Amino acid sequence: MHCPFCRHDDSRVVDSRTTDDGSSIRRRRQCPNCSKRFSTVETASLSVIKRSGAPEPFSRAKIASGVRKACQGRPVSEDDIALLAHRVEEAVRAQGAAEIDAHQVGLATLPFLQELDEVAYLRFASVYQAFDSLADFESAIDRLRAQRAAVAVPPVEPVAARG
């Protein structure tokens, strides 16, 4: 790493810390030539391969924008959307690949959106899973109902009042 002050071609790492969101590393460095200190922020690059084949840097804002459209008119806050976009980015980065297909990013979004809002999930899924008929929607709704029934907890019977 070049020193920004004297352009010396080497520096020593004095301290390393992850950023608050854990997506990058902040390093405090010192130049052995001029002894001045400076900070760097290092982030692993992640490229999304578009349908056209062109790569583009991963954008959490694009995830949020797509989810925001699916959530339009739904009781979902901006904080919920931002958290979902962060979780999608974490899931995509956890795969360890430097490049990922745009369609895969959309599919990675689905489980988090299903957890957040089922109607928004159906809207989003209809695009990313290319629904082209009413039967596709019915099938997705049936899967949601089956998943809900599988995790449903029977209601607790009220305890009779003691006298």
UniProtKB/Swiss-Prot annotation:
Chain intervals annotated as zinc finger (unnamed): 3-34
The keyword Amino-acid biosynthesis appears for this protein: no
Organism: Kineococcus radiotolerans (strain ATCC BAA-149 / DSM 14245 / SRS30216)
PROSITE patterns assigned: ATP_CONE
Biological process annotations from GO: negative regulation of DNA-templated transcription
Superkingdom of the organism of origin: Bacteria
Domain ATP-cone: 46-136
Protein name: Transcriptional repressor NrdR
Record's keyword terms, sorted: ATP-binding, DNA-binding, Metal-binding, Nucleotide-binding, Repressor, Transcription, Transcription regulation, Zinc, Zinc-finger
GO molecular function, a single term: zinc ion binding
The keyword Repeat is annotated on this UniProt entry: no
